[in-house]
Amino acid sequence: AWLCIAFSVVLTITTVALTRPMLVLMQTPEDILDGAVIYIGWIFASIPFIFLYNMVAGIMRALGDSKTPLYFLILTSVLNIGLDLLFIVPFKMGILGAALATDISQAISGVVSFAFLCRKFEVLHMQKGEWAVSKRACVRLMGIGVPMGLQCSITAIGSVIMQWAVNVLGSTAVAAVTAASKTMNLLTVPLESIGTAMATYAGQNLGAARMDRVRRGVAGALLIATVYSIASAVILHFADVAVMSLFLDTTTEVEIVAMGREYLFWNSVFFVPLGALIVWRYSIQGLGFSTLAMMAGVAEMIARTAVAIVLVPMLGYFGAELANPAAWIAACVFLYPAYIWTCRQLDNRLLAARLHMQNQAPDHEPAL
């Protein structure tokens, strides 16, 4: 908890203060710069609530409750969409309304999930002597969490570079990619939930020395992710405009809608690799090899950077549409052999541990 408080305060102050300079550095078009500063600045202001929810969700999953965090995640998504419609349509709050909708939904999700955690798990109620900061625990948590955080940061760097390339294409391209990305984020929430469930499942079964269950779990998760990816891609093909209408006026923004549909098409074709990427990455994290998961983020960053530098200048908007698919495929090419290697390493470790225990067991001679 103390680590979350410290990191959230530092990150909130830093990011809010640097919002405009970062957007200027990314060559954000002048006609949308002020609006972008308002929106992203308010989003950064909600960082403490994001930390709160993720801390609570991680604790719940570690205690064997993987369903409740999913319910709160769904609540956040539905509430966010509802508040978007309320603030933007009747209240006419525009960009500020969209940002506040996100902040409020994340705040409610974080606070309510924390209250639920405290009520359901009495073992977590803190006593007087337990509020002190444990340096040993902080070092251990940072050793696990920093590589995972770096993985997300590295992936985000690739996305920022890609966004810089899109910004050069103009405000229409930016609006199209933004609307399409929000639509994709809405549809890929279940995939992320499958991944987080696999992280917990893999870690628990590793603790029980049941790598056979880990393999079966990964195979089942891949099947579920593949079926969902295909189904969501098909649904998106027929209902893309309807879903995008949640984020923009599809009756007047004809050019943006057309570009957004094209972006969604090329990305949805590659939802299956995205699902596999998420399952393998979270499983590897759950098995304790977070550095490998971070290296997959490096592969994504390299792919997005290459697309931004090479394909976007050559192909324009179509090049930007290929950024996510290229990143997903690059990560999969790395993660699949990494997953196989991880399982073999753990098999060898568990076998060595069993042999060691057998050798240490005292030999009992039968009584005469």
Language model region names:
Residues 42-61, 69-77, 98-113, 192-195, ...:
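Short runs within selected transmembrane alpha-helices of multi-pass transporters and secretion channels
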Residues 1-46, 90-146, 202-269, 311-368:
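Short alpha-helical transmembrane segments in multi-pass integral membrane proteins
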Residues 10, 14, 44, 48-49, ...:
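Residue-level hotspots within pore-lining transmembrane alpha-helices
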Residues 19-22, 83, 157-170, 198, ...:
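Hydrophobic/aromatic end-of-helix segments at the C-terminal termini of transmembrane alpha-helices
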Residues 13, 21, 55-59, 78-86, ...:
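Alpha-helical transmembrane segments of multipass membrane proteins
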Residues 42, 53, 76, 105-109, ...:
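Transmembrane helical elements of multi-pass membrane transporters/channels
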Residues 1-13, 17-18, 50-69, 176-240, ...:
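Small-residue-rich hydrophobic transmembrane alpha-helices
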